[in-house]
């Protein structure tokens, strides 16, 4: 994406080489430039296999590794290095729908940071992973989401600290984080669409929670260090339990998990007693992937439009049953966000459409919907309700 759209648009990831395939490129760069590198095995977690190096000889030849330029001037909290674990929820890939959790975990190292190569082997100084630092004699847990103490803070505590103590514009910083999150998910969109078509029978089965690890440098610039596709939900500390517990609740409410209709009579009776209503299992009509030829024709015509003004004028005029199902799902999610923020699509995110490998109809549909009803959702919802009363979405 950086090669295609330039570093001006994709400059939020430190220079990274995938080894052993890109070892020659790493070798050439290290010959011309001094610097520190953090090397880690792909797919590893909890700080396993990570080390900080300055020479190519310190990196194994043939192992699968990721070498990333180390940010040697991070922002510090009382002299301590830290990073931020953010939670990103993908509820759909076509159309793309992304939510960013407003709370997160700030993980602090346990030894004061020294910018000196003689200290590169000190894992308690350079690694912020709680799974590493909990073995440090200096580690202090935190049981309060409102206090800036110990080696783990809540994200809201960090924002409050940076705002009041250092005068940081948190809204501007949050917008930068949203920007890098959206661009990162778009960079994987084409691959995820292709994979989902092969493995997913229904869009209702598609959702994924990601852990984004972000570091602030000395200028408060956010850098994306890595993305975890299976972030730990273990309550390692009292604060973890508080944050992750609420996260799990909001996450499950938002994805709208559907109870399968394969339950026996006894199980259904128990479920109805718990939910105090009938029809708690999903409706198979909503799971249909069949799209009529009229739907396909409309989609084809609008995907060929290369002007936003053109499709904004026409795409919402005659909604198809398939359109209505997509829009119902969209509005249902928004009503259950909890502490998640919908960051894509919004009425302002149309500028990201140019970064997609391919223009997809449903992204255009939601862009138009957000433009028309994003600031007045009740009007759009009333329109959908009228169509649903006629069972138009099931036709």
Name what the model sees in each region.
Residues 212-214:
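Hydrophobic residue at the +6 position relative to the catalytic HRD Asp in the kinase catalytic loop
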Residues 1-4, 13-23, 29, 58, ...:
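Acidic, PEST-like segments
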Residues 217:
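Short, acidic, Ser/Thr-enriched surface-loop or helix-capping motifs
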Residues 15-17, 34-60, 75, 84-85:
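Glycine-rich phosphate-binding loop of ATP-grasp-fold ATP-dependent ligases
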């Amino acid at each position: 994406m950086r090669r295609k759209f330039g570093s001006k648009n994709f400059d939020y990831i430190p220079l990274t080489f995938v080894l052993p395939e890109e070892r020659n490129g790493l070798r050439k760069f290290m010959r011309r430039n001094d610097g520190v590198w953090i090397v880690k095995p792909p797919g590893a977690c909890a700080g396993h296999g990570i080390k900080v190096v300055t020479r190519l000889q310190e990196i194994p030849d043939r192992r699968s590794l990721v070498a990333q330029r180390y940010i040697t001037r991070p922002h510090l909290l009382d002299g301590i290095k830290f990073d931020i674990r953010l939670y990103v929820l993908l509820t759909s890939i076509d159309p793309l729908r992304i939510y960013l959790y407003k709370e997160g975990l700030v993980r602090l190292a346990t030894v004061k940071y020294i910018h000196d190569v003689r200290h590169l082997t000190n894992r308690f100084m350079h690694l912020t992973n709680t799974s590493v630092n909990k073995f440090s004699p200096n580690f202090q847990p935190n049981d309060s989401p409102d206090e800036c103490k110990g080696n783990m803070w809540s994200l809201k505590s960090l924002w409050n600290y940076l705002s009041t103590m250092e005068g940081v514009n948190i809204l501007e910083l949050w917008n930068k984080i949203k920007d890098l999150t959206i661009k990162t998910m778009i960079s994987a969109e084409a691959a995820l669409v292709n994979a989902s078509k092969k493995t997913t029978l229904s869009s209702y089965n598609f959702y994924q929670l990601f852990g984004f690890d972000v570091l602030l440098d000395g200028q408060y610039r956010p850098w994306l260090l890595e993305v975890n596709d299976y972030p730990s939900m273990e309550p390692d500390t009292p604060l973890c339990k508080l944050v992750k517990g609420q996260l799990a609740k909001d996450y499950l409410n938002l994805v709208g998990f559907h109870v399968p209709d394969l339950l026996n009579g006894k199980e259904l009776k128990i479920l109805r007693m718990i939910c105090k209503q009938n029809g708690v299992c999903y409706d198979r009509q909503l799971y249909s992937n069949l799209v009529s030829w009229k739907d396909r024709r409309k989609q084809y015509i609008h995907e060929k439009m290369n002007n936003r003004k053109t499709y904004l004028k026409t795409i919402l005029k005659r909604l198809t049953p398939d359109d209505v199902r997509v829009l119902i799902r969209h509005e249902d999610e928004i009503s259950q966000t909890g502490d998640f923020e919908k960051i894509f699509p919004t009425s302002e995110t149309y500028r990201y459409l140019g970064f997609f490998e391919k223009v997809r109809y449903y992204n255009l549909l939601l862009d138009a919907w957000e433009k028309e009803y994003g600031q007045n959702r009740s009007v759009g919802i009333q329109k959908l309700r009228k169509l649903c009363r006629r069972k138009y979405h099931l036709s």
